[in-house]
Amino acid sequence: MSVTLSSEEMHAKTSVMASKDFLTDRIWLNGVEESASTGRLASCLQSVREAARAAGSEARVETDWRVHICSENNFPTAAGLASSAAGYACLVSALCKLYGIKSDVSALARRGSGSACRSVYGGFVRWFMGNREDGGDSVAAQLQPASHWPGLRVIICVASDHRKTTSSSLGMRNSVNTSELLKYRAEYSVPARSNISLSLYVS
């Protein structure tokens, strides 16, 4: 269960452009170029292109054209404020518009960042684990719009805007491999509490 914060206060903005003249995929984050050839971004781009080919989209750009991506956010990056979730949700939404993909973008956003599948929607959202081995049904769904609780406010105090020394992805992998408590939480605590929260949000 999660709550998507208002994009008026904290947001990511992303523009994408594809061209047959581009030699490689490139990305600029807050004005600084970063690698687009490895890691989650490369995997995300590949997944979106494969989805576009499978859907037979009628976009005016070819899936083998390279893309240039410009993204910026107005809050600290990699500092524990879900910048990856916001960034990948925004990026995949833009890519789906570029390639004419009309299907749910939640599963594609998850390829970049797990939490991004939730950030695609506003309001109150639940991320469903799914059963497929390829994770294709591990998607999010909106339970209630933001208007369900108009008086809700979130106070965020940034103690440090420096990048974390350990990324969220690596930290979670380490926790999965070393923590018995995390396994208990995933098997027992999360399902029970999610069902309680679900009954409250949809009532």
Functional labels for PLM-detected ranges:
Residues 146-203:
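C-terminal nucleotide
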Residues 43-47, 118-129, 188-195:
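Charged/polar, low-hydrophobicity segments characteristic of intrinsically disordered regions
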Residues 58-155:
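Gly/Ser-rich oxyanion-binding loop with an adjacent helix/lid
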Residues 9, 36-39, 86, 104, ...:
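Conserved active-site and cofactor/substrate-binding residues in soluble primary-metabolism enzymes
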Residues 43-50, 107, 111, 174, ...:
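Charged/polar, solvent-exposed surface patches and flexible loops
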Residues 53-58, 107-111, 162, 195-202:
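Noncatalytic linker/hinge segments flanking ATPase motor cores
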Residues 1-79, 93-102, 135, 159:
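ATP-binding N-lobe of GHMP and related small-molecule kinases
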